[in-house]
Amino acid sequence: MKTRFLEQIEEHTGIINKIVNLYADNTDDRQDLRQEILLQAWRSYASFENRSKFSTWLYRVCLNTALVFHRKSKRMVTVDIDNIKPLSNNNEVHHGAELLYLAVKQLPPAERSIIILHLDGYANEEIAEIIGISKNNAAVKLHRIKQTLTDKVRNEANRV
């Protein structure tokens, strides 16, 4: 069981990295959150029944752990633009993508979860299952989040 768990975690480490980087703003918090996610995943692995894909289950564990971590820290998500890591070291990264990344980082944690899943290609039905809401609620929330992001990116682009 341990070997299979470690293999699946290794295969889906990108999910963990993505959640950690979007929910923790400094190195210490990233390490703490990564450790907490791995611990929670291991603790609940025995209850994983293969009714969904492992990646779907892992997303749910990661997001739930990140939300609890965020609540425990009782910090508001603030973004210091000078400390934001660019999406790439490549100077050709499109400015709009950077603005979107910054806007996503500024969303409340629950909304951030929904848009991350959407950007990763999950359907509304899968998002609803992972987050624990109805499919219609997921669609409505996603529409509102997209509008919020569009407004934030547009406002920031106009400021520059």
Predicted regions and their residues:
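Hydrophobic positions on the alpha-helical face of helix-turn-helix-like DNA-binding modules
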Residues: 37, 61, 114-115, 127-128, ...
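Arg/Lys-rich amphipathic alpha helix in sigma70-family domain 2
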Residues: 47-49, 60-79, 93
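Acidic, proline/glycine-rich intrinsically disordered inter-domain spacer in sigma factors
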Residues: 76, 82-105
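DNA-recognition helix of helix-turn-helix
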Residues: 131-155
